[in-house]
């Protein structure tokens, strides 16, 4: 099918635009028609003789399961706005300044074991007996006047970030989508069965585009519209964290990570900063986990006679195409959203049979 005028081109389509979709496919020489985030293809398109390419975000669009099992949702470490003490007692609401629709405090006993309170002026960790927590607020005792204090804490991420961006930017009104953590055994079992069912119910699909895998790049929204994006980092690992991940890491490496390994005096572990030895260990730990789980998904897709492509953006953290484990996953194609020649090269040099640029 490939020639100078046809092939190697994927055209987005949408139900309701059948005539336009098929006319453009013919005019531009498309060999594949795909859906997009929030769109569907009608039978008129899927039965028109083109390869069909369907988009799946494996960790979202499972809101009913997330409501029934909220403990399977993803998390992150956050830190409160530093508060200057003016007396011996100081009160901090950890989530003040964050977007309330994105985060909820994880104040379970398991999570509280990882909370920390810091005197940032003296750069010292307060002992647990120096503070208490109740009803969404932390109360510090024996403060030093005019020292600045902050709380590092675990929070549930209750709105998947790409869906959140599309809602707030494009004024979507559909239900907010949540995200599951495949590290939770219940979520992982559910996701595998969901993918098998999806493959059975969509025999017309030739290629499944995973958008992407499990953990999104860090994108933290604030409550102030003038400072909506508090922090974003395309390659940060902060959104992979959970008590389960921290425990598994400690069992394997023989030492424990703390909130401060991620918060880093409020500077966070941004990609442009040289990684610490702890961060290097944690990155390798996450990459192996992601590769192992992704390989299982690819095997499921292949078992139904379909190809598995992956989008090199969004929930891509841990699957680095130039990392040690990417080629072991077995993807049939890599897709990259391109803004420059540098990103073209990022996609083109990866070890995978098909390279697709958006």
Segments and roles (model prediction):
Residues 2-4, 9-55, 194-211, 326-336, ...:
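Catalytic domains of carbohydrate-active enzymes, especially glycoside hydrolases
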Residues 26, 42-49, 294-307, 348-350:
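Surface-exposed amphipathic alpha-helices with a cationic face
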Residues 75-332, 339:
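Polysaccharide-binding and catalytic clefts of secreted carbohydrate-active enzymes
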Residues 40-87:
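Hydrophobic or amphipathic alpha-helical targeting/insertion segments
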Residues 350-358:
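Active-site core of glycosidic bond-cleaving carbohydrate-active enzymes
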Residues 52, 308-309, 354:
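Hydrophobic anchor at the start of a short beta-strand
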Residues 46-50, 67-71, 223-225, 322-329, ...:
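Short low-complexity, flexible loop/linker segments enriched in glycine and/or proline
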Residues 55, 311-313, 357:
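Conserved beta-strand termini and adjacent loop/short-helix elements that scaffold enzyme active sites
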């Amino acid at each position: 099918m490939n020639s100078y005028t046809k092939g190697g081109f994927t055209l987005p389509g949408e139900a309701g635009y059948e005539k336009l979709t098929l006319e453009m496919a013919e005019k531009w020489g498309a060999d594949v028609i795909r859906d997009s985030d929030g769109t569907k293809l009608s039978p008129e398109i899927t039965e028109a003789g083109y390869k069909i390419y369907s988009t799946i975000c494996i960790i979202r669009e499972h809101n009913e399961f997330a409501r029934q099992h909220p403990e399977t949702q993803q998390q992150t470490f956050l830190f409160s706005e530093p508060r200057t003490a003016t007396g011996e007692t100081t009160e901090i609401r950890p989530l003040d300044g964050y977007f309330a629709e994105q985060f909820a405090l994880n104040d379970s006993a398991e999570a509280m074991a990882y909370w920390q309170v810091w005197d940032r002026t003296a750069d010292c960790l307060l002992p647990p007996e120096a503070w208490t927590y109740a009803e969404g607020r932390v109360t510090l005792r024996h403060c030093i006047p005019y020292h600045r204090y902050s709380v590092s804490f675990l929070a549930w991420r209750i709105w998947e970030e790409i869906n959140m961006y599309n809602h707030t930017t494009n004024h979507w009104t559909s239900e907010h989508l949540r995200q599951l953590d495949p590290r939770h055994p219940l979520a992982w079992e559910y996701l595998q069965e969901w993918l098998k069912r999806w493959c059975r119910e969509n025999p017309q699909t030739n290629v499944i585009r995973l958008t992407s895998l499990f953990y999104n790049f860090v994108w933290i929204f604030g409550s102030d519209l003038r400072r909506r994006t508090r922090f974003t980092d395309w390659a940060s690992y902060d959104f992979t964290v959970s008590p389960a991940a921290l425990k598994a890491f400690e069992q394997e490496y023989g030492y424990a990570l703390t909130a401060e390994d991620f918060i880093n005096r409020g500077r966070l572990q941004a990609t442009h900063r040289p990684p610490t030895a702890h961060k290097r260990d944690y990155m390798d730990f996450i990459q192996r986990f992601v590769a192992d789980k992704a390989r299982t998904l690819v095997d499921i897709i292949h078992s139904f006679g379909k190809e598995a492509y992956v989008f090199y953006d969004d929930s891509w953290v841990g699957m680095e195409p130039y990392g040690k484990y990417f080629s072991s996953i077995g993807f049939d194609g890599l897709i990259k959203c391109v803004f420059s020649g540098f990103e073209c090269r990022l996609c083109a040099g990866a070890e995978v049979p098909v390279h697709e640029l958006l």
